Amino acid sequence: MNVAYVGSLVPAKGFDLLASAWPAVLAKVPDAQLFVVGSGKLYNRNSVLGKWNIADEKFENKFMKHITNDNQVLPSVHFLGVLGEEKNDLLLKCRVGVPNPSGNTETFGFTAIEMQSMGCNITTMKCSGYLDTVFTKRYLYYNSNNLAKNIIKLLLQKEHDYNEVYSFIKQNFSFDKIVLEWEQLFKEALPGHKLLHPYSIKKNPFYRLKFIKLGLQGMKFRFNFLNQLPTIEYFLQHSWDKVLWHINNK
């Protein structure tokens, strides 16, 4: 009943969301174990860590209160620091992987690929990168309040489509596949080409109004004055996202 988090322990990577969900997971799955691979020093070895030597003091204070008791880390939580390839041995023993629960700053999310290739089921924020890299999308959430519920379901489920997941990764993210896509990108980036990604509309066209964004991208090549207009993402962040937040937090 193991759960894994792999990543930097900084606010942008959202570990605090997983920590706050952990007590609810334990309430339903008492033998669940959380393995945390990473550190506040992952990307900056000169960072000053807090009391627990895990993350920045302010960030530690935000998440440690959820996973400590009597000033001791819960027995079910294991901080392993920064690991190399040996983390794969750990992931092979985990049922659930939770990469960046906040989804912030993610454009691809390679950790999700690593976790799935080792047999982990994924639950995390429904955002651009993970829509492409996560095979089973029904456990991607808009609201982090669903994180604990998703972890519990994945820990308790009896069946897992390992073969389909592995085929998905091999077909979409193998070395041979990615090298050809880079070659295609460089060729299409030559001067005079209308779009760098004319085929990208095929994937998740309605997410964040992607089909409109790509349509405008083509028009902006022809009509420069359109570059002065607010972006579609700006519109979403200042209208639709706020509506969703109020609905989810009622």
Features from the language model and the residues they span:
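Nucleotide-activated donor-binding/catalytic signature segment of Leloir-type glycosyltransferases, i.e.
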Residues: 47-82
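Short glycine/serine-rich donor-binding loops of glycosyltransferases
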Residues: 109-112
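C-terminal amphipathic helix plus adjacent low-complexity
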Residues: 166-250
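Short hydrophobic beta-strand element within catalytic cores of glycosyltransferases
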Residues: 117-124
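Short acidic alpha-helix that forms the nucleotide-activated donor recognition element
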Residues: 64-69, 84-94, 117
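Acidic donor-binding loop of glycosyltransferase active sites
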Residues: 92-107
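Conserved donor-binding/catalytic core segment of Leloir-type glycosyltransferases
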Residues: 1-13, 19-23, 34-37
